From Swiss-Prot:
Keywords carried by this UniProt record: Decarboxylase, Lyase, Pyrimidine biosynthesis
PROSITE patterns for this protein: OMPDECASE
Organism name: Streptococcus pyogenes serotype M5 (strain Manfredo)
Name of the protein in question: Orotidine 5'-phosphate decarboxylase
Subunit field text: Homodimer.
Gene3D superfamilies linked: Aldolase class I
Source taxon at top rank: Bacteria
Chain's gene name: pyrF
Family in the record: Belongs to the OMP decarboxylase family. Type 1 subfamily.
Pfam families noted in UniProt: OMPdecase
Length: 230
């Protein structure tokens, strides 16, 4: 099911920056936000509790990757924060993914990271010694995530159609690296606009700097939301 709101990546490290950004929005505007490593490691669980207290949805993007028992226990702790979505690394293997599902339970959405959108095929082959194509690697990880009963994967929008062709109906694709037309792509290698991501079948999109660093973040958010909605 397509999420109508773009997920905003809160690429901050301080509580003050985070609060100042969220305070720009009307109280009745309930957002879906991503808390990544920088903000979570700086502020800890309290930042999740604060944002949830405002009525926003929280995607906690920590990309867990460890032995199954450790991941299971960590997910059980994160479940107590009432998060709406969490991530693990698909490279941890099917048993680790199953353990993550057991720890988090069936309520929150659980998705696996396949290949980062900052990774090119040449980098994957050189750094990871994976000699298939980038798409084949992503499809392999996606099928493993589906086998482990995860809800979906993080992937580039260019890979969405192929992933949906080899996974069960309802398997979701969350797409980072979304940039409005004409914006700076930064360190992302595989990017699309919100309109392109919608047309190709992405279920969630994540947008950070084009919103958080905009002169008018609320206007930027509303414009991207409208483009995403079609």
């Amino acid at each position: 099911m397509k999420e109508e709101r773009p997920i905003i990546a809160l690429d901050f490290s301080s509580f003050e920056e985070t609060k100042a950004f969220l305070d720009l929005f009307p109280a009745e505007e309930k957002l879906y936000v991503k808390i990544g490593m920088e903000l979570y490691y700086a502020q800890g669980p309290d930042i999740v509790r604060y944002i949830k207290s405002l009525g926003h949805n929280v995607f906690l993007d920590l990309k867990l990757h460890d032995i199954p028992n450790t991941v299971r226990a960590a997910m059980a702790v994160l479940k107590e924060l009432d998060i709406d979505m969490a991530t693990v690394h698909a490279a941890g293997g099917v048993e680790m993914l199953k353990a993550a599902r057991e720890g988090l339970g069936q309520g929150p959405t659980l998705i696996a990271v396949t290949q980062l959108t900052s990774t090119s095929e040449d980098q994957m082959r050189g750094d990871q010694n994976i000699q298939t194509s980038l798409l084949e690697s992503v499809l392999h990880y996606s099928k493993g995530a589906a086998k482990a009963q995860l809800d979906g994967v993080v992937c580039s929008a260019q890979e969405v159609e192929a992933i949906k062709a080899v996974t069960p109906t309802g398997f979701t694709c969350l797409t980072p690296g979304i940039r409005p037309k004409g914006s700076n792509i930064g360190d992302q290698k595989r990017v699309m606009t919100p309109n392109q991501a919608r047309r190709i079948g992405s279920d969630y999109i994540v947008v950070g700097r084009p919103i958080t660093q905009a002169k008018d973040p609320v206007a930027a958010y509303q414009a991207i939301k409208a483009e995403w909605a079609g």
